[in-house]
């Protein structure tokens, strides 16, 4: 999916839900809108804090129910290793396999379609008689910006942000 505006993304989600005959409630739409404004993954509780700006009465079950719906529809992915959620940038391709690249330094999460891996996963699943419904592959490492920061040997003379604390220690 090309870079789309938030309004285009929400309109696309509404259209998909109408085609599937499922209800995209105003609350679900608002959670999706908030997700679309994030640069990367966000925890349910951070999402709740954002939702409370518009809906002060919102409680954790409100967010979790909305996230469950958005997960079922393929609009978001759960990043299991960080217990966070990220907008799916490929939700116009409902059967895709996602590869999530998670930066252990800054926490950025980038999604890529893993077409070649998808075939391998289906072959392995078929050997076991396993019926795959959805694949998400998570890989941890450093994003390009953090690789550059970690390679920097002169922090006092560079333009890098050395203040970011490592989110997860490498194994």
Curated annotation (Swiss-Prot):
Classification via Gene3D superfamilies: 3.30.1490.190, Winged helix-like DNA-binding domain superfamily/Winged helix DNA-binding domain (1.10.10.10)
Listed GO CC annotations: cytosol; protein-DNA complex
Coiled coil (UniProt feature): none
A Pfam entry, by short name: FUR
Domain of life according to the entry: Bacteria
Molecular-function GO term, any one: DNA-binding transcription repressor activity
Keywords tagged on the record: DNA-binding, Repressor, Transcription, Transcription regulation, Zinc
One annotated GO biological process: regulation of secondary metabolite biosynthetic process
InterPro entries, A to Z: FUR, Fur_C, WH-like_DNA-bd_sf, WH_DNA-bd_sf
Function: Acts as a negative controlling element, employing Zn(2+) as a cofactor to bind the operator of the repressed genes (znuACB).
Family, per entry: Belongs to the Fur family.
Record-given protein name: Zinc uptake regulation protein
Protein's gene: zur
